[in-house]
Amino acid sequence: MLWNLLALHQIGQRTISTASHRHFKNKVPEKQKLFQEDDGIPLYLKGGIADALLHRATMILTVGGTAYAIYQLAVASFPNKGVTSIIPAITWFTFIQLSMDQKSDK
């Protein structure tokens, strides 16, 4: 039993140590030159299309999340004024609030 485990351990070491090593080109100096150029392009757009899409998605999510948080604060501030009818949105908070209001009316 112990010999089997020892043989298995040696096979595992042999396959790892004899694997071919892939050498990748170091792209850091190229990227440094690209990002340090003073060409008037904003830094967040120098990375190409992927960086531009990532920046736009981040901005949309940030602005949308901020607007949603402000909306939820308004809903929580005026529970009896009917702010939820101005901007229709079904949330867990308003669902619980409405179900509690229906129970208290009975």
Curated annotation (Swiss-Prot):
Tell me which InterPro entries the record gives: COX7a, Cyt_c_oxidase_su7a_sf, Cytc_oxidase_su7a_met
Keywords assigned by UniProt, alphabetized: Membrane, Mitochondrion, Mitochondrion inner membrane, Transit peptide
Q: Which domain of life is it from?
A: Eukaryota
Compartment annotation: Mitochondrion inner membrane
Q: Any idea which residues the transit peptide spans? A: 1-23
Mainly localized where?
A: mitochondrion
Provide a GO CC annotation, any one.
mitochondrial inner membrane
Q: Name one GO biological process term.
A: mitochondrial respirasome assembly
Family according to the record: Belongs to the cytochrome c oxidase VIIa family.
| Protein name listed in UniProt | Putative cytochrome c oxidase subunit 7A3, mitochondrial
Q: Which organism is it from?
A: Homo sapiens (Human)
